[in-house]
């Protein structure tokens, strides 16, 4: 493939602060960049189709060419669909302490039956609200398990985006700028066949978590460096973000992406796509 596919993803639509989600939609309209939003079907204990403000915004997102896929069920637990990776637990000390204290208890909640039930309930609300079945999934806090992947396959899901290429974005969240976290050797920066036949489409990292203007250059340097490295190996550039952590008083995150979009466009061989379009174009290498 001669072009680089760039897919921005964004989590937790359907949760709190819809006005901040609307701010992100306005930014994306101006930038003409499609995004894959991972939507909470039962956020804050309320079904998505009982939230008229969110329904209007999500319909606007679809009309603008964005993609909506399933995110968790209600995002009520760090361990909702499995155990998050270590670099994620490092920024959630209470969850890390619980995992270290009672791993058997945590894992008891990840049976195939329980994972299947949560996915089925979330999928049903999603279909009822939006009129189609989701084919992609992301767990809350990147929490996943083998049983979750099997349950996704059993419910007709095609792909997930939960694995991480470069954990440094989370080290930056903890202000651990000198961690030297390497790219993960077992996570390629492109789609590949994973557990239970599900296609995994990894994210490279998260770069825009509650940034201040003083963070701008450091985080832009990280995201551009990762982008250039992905291009050098012929991979796909998929990033994670959260609408409420890059809007409102935290719009430095939008400025980081504004700079990266401008840089990417200057190269002339970059295409902005949703995750499903990325998969259609790139395929799954043998």
Which positions does each model-derived feature cover?
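The substrate-binding groove and active-site-proximal loops of carbohydrate-active enzymes
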Residues: 6-16, 38-48, 104-114, 133-135, ...
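CE4/NodB-like, metal-dependent polysaccharide N-deacetylase domain
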Residues: 28-34, 96-145, 201, 229-240
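Acidic (Asp/Glu)-rich catalytic clusters
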Residues: 22-33, 48-73, 83-93, 153, ...
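Active-site-adjacent pocket scaffolds in enzyme catalytic domains
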Residues: 48, 77-78, 139-233
């Amino acid at each position: 493939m001669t072009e680089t596919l760039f897919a921005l993803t964004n989590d937790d639509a359907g949760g709190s602060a819809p006005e901040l989600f609307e701010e992100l939609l306005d930014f994306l309209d101006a930038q003409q960049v499609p995004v894959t939003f991972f939507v909470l079907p039962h956020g804050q204990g309320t079904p998505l189709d009982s939230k008229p403000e969110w329904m209007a915004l999500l319909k606007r997102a679809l009309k603008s060419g964005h993609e909506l896929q399933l995110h968790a069920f209600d995002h009520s637990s760090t361990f909702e669909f499995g155990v998050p990776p270590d670099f994620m637990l490092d920024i959630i000390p209470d969850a890390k302490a619980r995992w270290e204290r009672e791993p058997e208890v945590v894992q008891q909640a990840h049976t195939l039956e329980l994972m299947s039930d949560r996915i089925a309930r979330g999928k049903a609300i999603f279909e009822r609200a939006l009129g189609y079945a989701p084919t992609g999934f992301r767990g809350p806090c990147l929490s996943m398990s083998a049983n979750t992947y099997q349950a996704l396959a059993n419910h007709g899901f095609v792909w997930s985006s939960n694995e991480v290429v470069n954990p440094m974005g989370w080290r930056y969240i903890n202000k651990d700028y000198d961690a030297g976290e390497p790219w993960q050797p077992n996570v390629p920066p492109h789609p590949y066949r994973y557990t239970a036949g599900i296609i995994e489409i990894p994210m490279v990292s998260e770069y825009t978590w509650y940034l201040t203007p003083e963070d701008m250059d450091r985080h832009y340097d990280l995201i551009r460096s990762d982008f250039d490295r992905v291009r050098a190996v012929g991979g796909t550039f998929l990033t994670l973000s959260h609408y409420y952590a890059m809007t409102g008083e935290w719009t430095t995150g939008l400025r980081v992406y504004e700079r990266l979009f401008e840089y990417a466009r200057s190269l002339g061989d970059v295409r902005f796509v949703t995750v499903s379009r990325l998969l259609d174009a790139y395929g799954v290498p043998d």
